[in-house]
Design a protein with these regions (language model features):
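DUTPase catalytic domain/fold
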Residues: 1-191
Length: 191
């Protein structure tokens, strides 16, 4: 079976190519790219697309500020040529979410094979303070996914139980024994 190839076009020679961080990486890193100028901004309160002027830090690095609870369209400068029956899924890098408190505004980006325009990252600042979004920085990661064709069928009765599961949303972490402290789920982090 041939390995599919994800082709990409860079809008300029200064755009950093997506790349796998290690030989075992499931996803490829995606870099931000913007020049001196403006970065698109979506303001929740006005529901209008505006732009914010870029700045330079003391080392000359280009950045733009994203304020608390704001969403910003961060350009990548990349257009993907996605194989038929595939899509690209875009995720925030875990270090960016943990260290910087930045998330993808749509949770997960989905780029369809028939979308042939430049890709943006919808960054959301979940912090109480402003953050700097730097040019040529790895904020997201992408993966090529095989799409499976399926139909949607309405049924007249609610689905019945298929396993021993009892309870609704989030019930797989609920035990019938009394709790002896905070639930740690499967990650080891207290919730």
């Amino acid at each position: 079976m041939a390995i599919p190839s994800l082709k990409f076009y860079k809008e300029s020679e200064y755009i950093l190519s997506p790349e796998f961080g290690t030989t075992g990486s499931a996803c490829f890193d995606i870099y931000s790219h913007f020049d001196d100028g403006h970065v698109p901004l979506w303001l929740d309160d006005k529901e209008a697309r505006q732009a914010r002027q870029t700045k330079r830090d003391s080392q000359g690095n280009i950045y733009v500020l994203i304020y608390p609870q704001e969403r910003m369209l961060v350009p990548t400068g990349l257009t993907f040529d996605i194989p038929k029956d595939h899509s690209v899924r875009i995720h925030i890098r875990s270090s960016v979410a943990l260290r910087d408190g930045l998330l993808l505004g749509n949770g997960e980006g989905v780029v369809d094979s028939d979308y042939v325009d430049p890709c943006y990252l919808i960054l959301y600042n979940a912090n109480n303070t402003a953050r700097q979004i730097f040019n040529n920085t790895r904020y997201a990661q992408g993966e090529l996914i095989k799409n499976y064709k399926y139909s949607l069928t309405e049924v007249k009765e609610a689905p019945g139980q298929k396993t021993e599961r009892e309870g609704g949303f989030g019930s797989t972490d609920v035990k019938s024994e009394p709790s002896k402290g905070p639930s740690t789920g499967t990650s080891g982090l207290a919730i």
